[in-house]
Curated annotation (Swiss-Prot):
Its cofactor is Mg(2+); Mn(2+). Its EC number is 1.1.1.267. This is 1-deoxy-D-xylulose 5-phosphate reductoisomerase. It catalyses: 2-C-methyl-D-erythritol 4-phosphate + NADP(+) = 1-deoxy-D-xylulose 5-phosphate + NADPH + H(+). The lineage of its organism: Bacteria, Pseudomonadati, Campylobacterota, Epsilonproteobacteria, Campylobacterales. It comes from Campylobacter hominis (strain ATCC BAA-381 / DSM 21671 / CCUG 45161 / LMG 19568 / NCTC 13146 / CH001A). SUPFAM superfamilies: 1-deoxy-D-xylulose-5-phosphate reductoisomerase, C-terminal domain, Glyceraldehyde-3-phosphate dehydrogenase-like, C-terminal domain, NAD(P)-binding Rossmann-fold domains. Belongs to the DXR family. NADPH binds at T7, G8, S9, I10, A31, N33, N111, E113, G184. Pathway: Isoprenoid biosynthesis; isopentenyl diphosphate biosynthesis via DXP pathway; isopentenyl diphosphate from 1-deoxy-D-xylulose 5-phosphate: step 1/6.
């Protein structure tokens, strides 16, 4: 298999699954973590590697190295593996996702932005989603009656217990303290703003064709997804907070081995809550984005600029949501007709967001 984003959380867990099941790793790709990439090269002996920054090529312990803007697609052209894990972060994952599908390979997708931005240009019936919520929905849908409603859950993020009046003063270090999951910086901030849950609802729309979608806060992150059926019954999917389960099922669809220990039902203290729009204003866009999924590229571009500005201390926490709302208001009439349009719209919105944040 090929692992794009191999040094991140999903990539690292994917390689743990490869190690456990003796899966050959043909290629690895990362942005800049040379030390971790070299350790992975030493263990898995890939044929090809990619590093985003060309200046770092000399530090990579390999003789077949790709880099630069088109390097991942060039590397994929050389790869014979049928399975590719796309665990890249942000909009940068879109073109590789399109390339993977166009080449007939199996796309195991952790890069949610590919669906958020370009879901209508991907064959979602052939995507194996690496996400605890969407794996949960898939698990519940198998051998089940037609669903009436799908529900995914949110932990509430780092500021779940923080009073609304205190949010404006919160810094990146505060937002990065997720109560349940060990994730990368961007997705942890997205969890705190609830942008991550908005994205996951759009993912669920593209993956399963259901518009009757909702999300609830379940603070323990033990319940990942629920489905309400027409007959009035409800099914829930529970597992420990470990992405290796979703990854293993994406890589090995006929999996019959233990990946995680079962949830200790006797220790659970489950409760569900509505998502408070005053605390998580981004979630107010839920119905609008489900009725007009083309907004995904606008929301994602504004969010990426604002999140990375926040991480660098260049804007406040609440500026993330306000920047997104301004971008949606200004560009909601833009409709991408192809992948090239997505790239153009993404660039326009990013420039607008930078201007609004005075970056």
């Amino acid at each position: 298999m090929v692992v794009l984003g191999s040094t991140g959380s999903i990539g690292t867990n994917s390689l743990e699954i490869a190690r456990k099941f003796n899966i050959e790793v043909e290629a690895l790709a990362c942005a800049e973590n040379v030390k971790k990439l070299n350790a992975q090269i030493a263990e898995f002996h890939p044929k090809f590697v990619y590093i985003k920054d060309e200046k770092l090529k000399s530090k990579v312990a390999h003789n077949k190295i790709f880099s630069g803007e088109n390097g991942i697609c060039e590397m994929l052209n050389r790869c014979e593996s049928k399975t590719v894990i796309n665990a890249l972060v942000g909009f940068a994952g879109l073109i590789p996702s399109l390339k993977i599908q166009n080449s007939g390979k199996i796309l195991c997708l952790s890069n949610k932005e590919s669906l958020v931005v370009g879901g209508k240009f991907l064959d979602t019936s052939k995507i194996r989603a690496i996400d605890s919520e969407h794996f949960g929905l898939k698990f519940l849908l198998e051998n089940s009656a037609k669903p009436a409603k799908m529900i995914i859950t949110a932990s509430g993020g780092a500021f779940y217990k923080t009073p609304i009046k205190d949010l404006s003063s919160k810094k990146a270090a505060d937002a990065l303290k997720h109560p349940n999951w060990n994730m990368g910086a961007k997705i942890t901030i997205d969890s705190a703003t609830m942008a991550n849950k908005l994205f996951e609802m759009l993912e669920a729309f593209w993956l399963y064709g259901c518009k009757n979608l909702d999300a609830l806060i379940e603070p323990s992150s033990s319940v990942h997804a629920l489905i309400e059926f027409i007959d009035g019954s409800t099914a829930a999917h529970l597992s420990r907070t470990d992405m290796k389960l979703a990854i293993a099922h994406a890589i090995l669809p006929n999996l019959k081995s233990e990946i995680l220990k079962p949830v200790d039902l006797l220790s659970l203290n489950l409760k569900f809550e509505k998502i408070d729009i005053k605390k998580y204003p981004i979630f107010e866009l839920k119905d609008e984005v489900l009725s007009n999924p083309d907004l995904g590229v606008i929301i994602n571009a504004a969010n990426e600029i604002a999140v990375f500005a926040f991480l660098q201390g260049k804007c406040g926490f609440l500026d993330i949501s306000s920047t997104i709302f301004k971008a949606v208001e200004k560009f909601n009439d833009l409709t991408p007709e192809n992948a090239e349009d997505l790239i153009k719209i993404d660039k326009i919105v990013r420039n607008f967001a930078r201007s609004e944040l005075r970056l």
